[in-house]
Amino acid sequence: MSEKMYPIPFASLMNWVVTEYAQSGDIFGVHKKYEATGKSLPIFGERIETPFGPAAGPNSQLAQNIIAAYFAGARFFEVKTVQKMDGADLAACVPRPCILAADEGYNQEWSTELTVPQAQDEYIKAWCALKVISKVYGLGDPDGFVFNMSVGYDLEGIKGRKVNSYIDNMMDASRTAQFKECKKVLTELFPAERDFIAHISPRVSRSVTVSTLHGCPPQEIERIASYLLTKKHLHTFVKCNPTILGYKTARSILDSMGYDYIVFDEHHFNEDLQWEDAVPMFERLQKLADKEGLEFGLKLSNTFPVDTTRGELPNDEMYMSGRSLFPLTIEMCNRISRAFGGKMRISFAGGAEYFNCDKLFAAGIWPITVATTILKPGGYNRLLQMVEKVEPMEYRAFAGTDSAAISDLAASARTNYHHLKPIKPLPSRKSTEQVPWLDCFIAPCKGGCPIEQDVPEYLELCRKGLYGPALKLITEKNALPFITGTICAHRCQGKCSRNFYEESVHIRDTKLLAAQKGYNALMASIKLPERVEGKRVAIIGGGPTGIAAAYFCGRAGIETTIFERERKLGGVPRYVIPAFRISDEAIDKDIALMMSYGVEVKCGKSAPSVAELKEMGYTHILLATGAWKAGKLDIEGNVQGVIEWMKKEKKQVKPNLSGNIVVVGAGNTAMDAARVAKRMGAHATILYRRTKKFMPADEHELQLAIDEGVEFIELAAPVKQAKGMLLCDKMVLGEPDETGRRSPVKSGEQFSIPCDLVLSAVGEQVDSDLMAANGIEMERKGPAFETNVEGVYCAGDAHRGPATVVEGIADAARFAEAVIGVPYEYEIPAQAFITESDAIAKHGILKMSGKCEGERCLQCSTVCENCVDSCPNRANVAVVMPDESHQIIHVDKMCNECGNCTQFCPYASEPCHDKFTLFQTAEDMVESKNPGVLFLDGDHVRVRMAEERDYDLTTSDNDLPVDIEALIFTIRDKYSYLFA
């Protein structure tokens, strides 16, 4: 495809609006409709029904973007900046991709990529469309919204013919061809509104926001604002850069909030507008505005320039936005409000979103414009929730800002969960698969789970209070619901799409809830299966993997015996993991579930040899011995393996430790050991070669250790323990490896810390003696983990090395399938599914809690549409097929390859390049490599799949795949407005 987007003619645009609204009640894919209540706020001699709208940027560049935002509740539109450089010249300066909004936002955009006349036409089209749909569809007062121009970047350019004409035409569009065309088209579409349409005001905008480049001298800023106030008589905002805070303040704030990896130097801070120049200039401009009878204020803030250091975007510098910008912007507001005694009007942009918008409004900061939040899943739909949060508050004319409230908000922002960077970066939510052309909706949580639990389905059952069926569904694939509901590494939660909203659904907790509430019913329903003849299974090792394997085999009716050398089953969870993390009762319930299928258990002595087991008639033998052997830490001194130490300490009832214990390593086991040492009376320290960000422990476990007072020493490696001290090498982080982890390198410096005992938690190992004694060669494992000895298998730690519980269950299931000979099949109850409309209703709603976590589940496998929501231009469209399924098509003409949809697609793909594409012209198709369709006429199409061919839709033997043909027919018959 080409990065060149082009505007939709107004007649086609309105045909889309009218047809889609009639068919579905949506407009440009936005599902959440705001209907104004009659309240409004005065501004610029006009009124706005809500204080929200899109900031000058990707969401206010095209007419459809503005209409989509209005439909969801926006009423203040800061349309995208225009300047003397435009069109192809400007687009050539913008790299692709240019937007990265997966977490805090970054972009390399600039002003509009259209020509200035095209941009003007887009804004006039949007203005006229909103005037009519507000009335016809009952969305609000046709005079209840405001368009605010954004112009830059120097006075010469602003006074030049191109931008000057734009300003004049936005102030009075009556003489423009576009305004006349809009009124003509609208009159044809809505003849009953002829008189109303005839009187649509041509005064599209009576206000402006001044945007200047970094390094613009204060004198130039003042000249621009003065010109717009006195010569154009426009209400004026001046946009300020966060650099006005000073380098030390910005660096300190970001570092303290976990954004220490964001790189920037002092040059912008030194070259941009300085505080001592800004305050007197703003005072002069305020007086000038008062003299002219106009409103003046500051737009806080512009995006923040930072270095591109990790290949985030193509150019060397990018502009930061979103949640990391909020603490900087609100600190700017704090200083401005105090400096001007609350009298300076502030228009906000810089990380505003649902969780802070009410506080901003209550402090007198409005209008509030947004960008990053509506570039995320939910997209424009997120605006409605913001509006509904603020609407019950008192609407009153601007009378000043509340300096005390802003100061409190600035202080709290630095510790607020929604603005802090997590200790550890979230893993990628993408799979390794390519997005299919059709039927692409998947639940990333399920794909991220080693056993592919039916997560959305059991969450929905729990939401409905059907805990018995929920647990039954869980145990179709998961033999250990209590253990995994308590200590699972929950990779599913790292993949959860809810992370793009606030935080993941608490999947593990809900699994435990289902286990607790559904256990009795499940146990009562279990019946001994009919015994399978000719197969007997022996499992050596009664830890999680062994229990799971026995469960799966026993459920299939295969005679199964577990051999465990300890007195009880349970392995590491029972004998090593501390009781404050998992109780014996929870472990026992999973064991009872397994034993309900008639599994025999032999505990308290070592298992017979493989040869002996075969002589006893066992046809399949599984080695499921855990990783009990200490990892090697090759230093002198008092060093113990963490597993044996924790096993010993678990037997202690009362605190029995003192002195200084240093745990070397940073996995979950290391966190457990440090917490045990701390609770048992010692001073506990975790020593790690890298930083917290790269620790392998789950963030939750890491945070618990921090909360309990465990000391962390980062960038350090042990050298020698002696005489109560541990000598350490000071490390530095080198270049990232292929996983993104930066390799630790010795700095040449050393230091010592108090230490009486070192615990080695650096990669536990499987005892290879058992393998060797039975002639098993570990490197020769075949399908389903069969070893070089026929009929003998390895699973869990014995197969992978130290493995998580759920990885052990996955191995156990594969082993059981090899024994049984056929895949296990089961049915998901109908109550576990929800409708497409119910799934869509969850989009755009930020929600930290609910009666049940199932309320927060987005049901991605029913309807994903992340690419639809996140596209500012609406270039990814969901079409409803005759069977009511939703399919995604990409509309080439509306896309500028910003790349935003790529961030949120759960596949290793780019929807703008990889989804089936609708082309507008033959030239567009030639310039693209996308798969897709071009309508040549009503019955003939050109389709590109593996190859490009023309097809006749009137013939039944046209060789088009049936599903692709159905999609093409649906586009032609129901969505012709997409290419009209």
Task: State what each model feature region is.
Residues 531, 536-538, 588-635, 720-726, ...:
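Feature captures the FAD/FMN-dependent oxidoreductase FAD-binding
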Residues 317, 323, 374-375, 381, ...:
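Ferredoxin-type iron-sulfur electron-transfer modules and their immediate structural context
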Residues 559-562, 566-601, 674-719:
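Rossmann-like dinucleotide-binding cores of NAD(P)H-dependent redox enzymes
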Residues 75-85, 242, 359-386:
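Glycine-rich phosphate-binding active-site loops on the catalytic face of alpha/beta enzymes
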Residues 540-561, 602-611, 625-633, 645-699, ...:
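Rossmann-like dinucleotide/flavin-binding elements
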